[in-house]
């Protein structure tokens, strides 16, 4: 199978490597490729949308003519992992913890409301062990992370974190074939990439 990583910004190399390691661990034959153009989305069995800065990613995708095609691919049922700013890009409702509504380009395919920069600035980044439904306990790295303020069906919360500033917050969501995280699993684990590959292989 061929799996793609949106390569406009963020931890592209880390996602590619996580897919390669996940495939090896599952004994699945998979080619991990960078996606920068709409035509490179054709024939993908799975997709990852990395973090970075969600407004920049959305505007770049729009300028490159890839935003609408991305939406179509995700809506068509291609198993998708979206991390941090990638999760923001997927959400139907987005606001910033400081400036409020953002008006940024969105895919708007995930039934979730997201608050950007919910934990503060870069210096407020942190790590925590997180129990994720269906995946297990993972070490999660939160870098200028968002939170999911709410979800509605068919999306559901699959992980929470208790934080002194943000309180008890949803930090991972699943909606059918989509996994979205507020943190960066590509930095610490292959668990989420394995889950997406297993969806693509019809195992999960």
From Swiss-Prot:
L-glutamine binds at residues 52-54, 116, 143-144. GO terms for cellular component: cytosol; glutaminase complex. GO terms for molecular function: glutaminase activity; pyridoxal 5'-phosphate synthase (glutamine hydrolysing) activity. The active site is at residues 84, 184, 186. CDD domains: GATase1_PB (cd01749). Pathway: Cofactor biosynthesis; pyridoxal 5'-phosphate biosynthesis. GO terms for biological process: glutamine catabolic process; pyridoxal phosphate biosynthetic process; pyridoxine metabolic process. In the presence of PdxS, forms a dodecamer of heterodimers. Only shows activity in the heterodimer. This is Pyridoxal 5'-phosphate synthase subunit PdxT. The gene is pdxT.
